[in-house]
């Protein structure tokens, strides 16, 4: 059996398909009736007669949309799926690169070495890699000549926590961004009881034990 389609058969198939398309384009649209058996010309495409009715799904007309129904309505409601982090609450920081007055947080810039200027299509990638390394090195403590001795006092107040509940406190968060050839870092504090999100957000205390400000974020608001 020959599995190849001849050139004249290809032309007939194309012509048949064009006739079917022109028929549906020229026929008036009458809701679900436009796909009934009566709307298809006999002999044009017999295989299309049974398929449309199997796939036909009735939808409410436009006149029912937006109307209020009494009791349990059978209309279709649109479902809006919120972002995955919407349930976490908090106030999203619209522009974490520039701290607003009274908002809290510090913006610092990791300057690049002027002698290192990569070129080519991977310039931004190389500069970002350099900025990331310098950003990480900022938080690496230098070697100490002597071992520090911490004096423990029972009942003493821990940093960033209330004396009645040492579990409450703040955690420091950072957001790195690449802006105009330099790496900018925005850092701020959030209560430790708040969730950690991918987007930069300010959260409020949920447990009631976290202070409004801690030793780390006092400098975020400037001088008192």
UniProtKB/Swiss-Prot annotation:
Polar residues biased stretches: 54-65
Transmembrane regions: none
Compartments reported by the entry: Virion; Host cytoplasm
Pfam families noted in UniProt: zf-Paramyx-P
Keywords linked to the UniProt accession: Host cytoplasm, Host-virus interaction, Inhibition of host innate immune response by virus, Inhibition of host interferon signaling pathway by virus, Inhibition of host MDA5 by virus, Inhibition of host RLR pathway by virus, Inhibition of host STAT1 by virus, Inhibition of host STAT2 by virus, Interferon antiviral system evasion, Metal-binding, Viral immunoevasion, Virion, Zinc
Biased amino acid composition, Basic and acidic residues: 151-172
GO cellular component terms, semicolon-separated: host cell cytoplasm
Amino acids binding Zn(2+) 1: 170, 189, 214, 217
Residues bound to Zn(2+) 2: 193, 205, 207, 210
Family affiliation: Belongs to the paramyxoviruses V protein family.
Name by which UniProt lists this protein: Non-structural protein V
Biological source species: Mumps virus (strain SBL-1) (MuV)
């Amino acid at each position: 059996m020959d599995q190849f389609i001849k050139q004249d058969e290809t032309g007939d198939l194309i012509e048949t398909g064009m006739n079917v398309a022109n028929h549906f384009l020229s026929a008036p649209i009458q809701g679900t009736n436009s796909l009934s058996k009566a709307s298809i010309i006999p002999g044009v495409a017999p295989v299309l007669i049974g398929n449309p009715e199997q796939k036909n799904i009735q939808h409410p007309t436009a006149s029912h949309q937006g109307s209020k129904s009494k009791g349990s309505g059978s209309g279709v409601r649109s479902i809006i799926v919120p972002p995955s982090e919407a349930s976490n609450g908090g106030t999203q920081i619209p522009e974490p690169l520039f701290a607003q007055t009274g908002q809290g947080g510090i913006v610092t810039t990791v300057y690049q070495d002027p002698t290192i200027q990569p070129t080519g299509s991977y310039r931004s990638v190389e500069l970002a890699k350099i900025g990331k390394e310098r950003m990480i090195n900022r938080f690496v403590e230098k070697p100490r000549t002597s071992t520090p001795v911490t004096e423990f006092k029972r009942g003493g107040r821990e940093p960033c926590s209330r004396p009645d509940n040492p579990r409450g406190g703040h955690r420091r968060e950072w957001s790195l961004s690449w802006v105009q050839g330099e790496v900018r870092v925005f850092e701020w504090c959030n209560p430790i009881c708040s969730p950690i999100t991918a987007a930069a957000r300010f959260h409020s205390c949920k447990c009631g034990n976290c202070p409004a400000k801690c030793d780390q974020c006092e400098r975020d608001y400037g001088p008192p």
